[in-house]
Amino acid sequence: MQASIIICACAIPNKAWVRRDGKKYSDVDVAIAMDHLVLAATDVGLGTCWIAAFDPAAAREVLGLPDSVEPIAFTPLGYAANQLGNRRRKTMMEIVKHERWQD
């Protein structure tokens, strides 16, 4: 991929909606926004991929993020250098559970 743009999706946890049990939804909200970005990019022929394995402190420093802003994920945005071949996908039976979790 020739990515001329790399997007860092960030959250502001202290402004997030909070569920009754105290769970802040900032990471979920960022994931929803990132998913929409990936779908829109794919729709116009651009390639993307989620990058969540990064050093948050280094990202904060490079991007000049204040302490109140949390980097959640990155994605490059560009045109694929070549087409990937078909990969084996898991079947629905491998990933969907019915009514109760069972291994």
Language-model regions: role of each:
Residues 59-72:
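Short, electropositive alpha-helical surface patch
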Residues 12-15, 56-57, 81:
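Short, charged/polar surface micro-motifs in flexible loops or helix N-caps
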Residues 36-37:
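Aromatic/hydrophobic pocket-lining residues that form π-stacking "cages" and hydrophobic walls in ligand
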Residues 45:
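Structured binding elements
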Residues 1-33:
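Glycine/small-residue-rich phosphate/adenosyl-binding loop
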Residues 48-52:
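Short beta-strand segments at enzyme active-site cores
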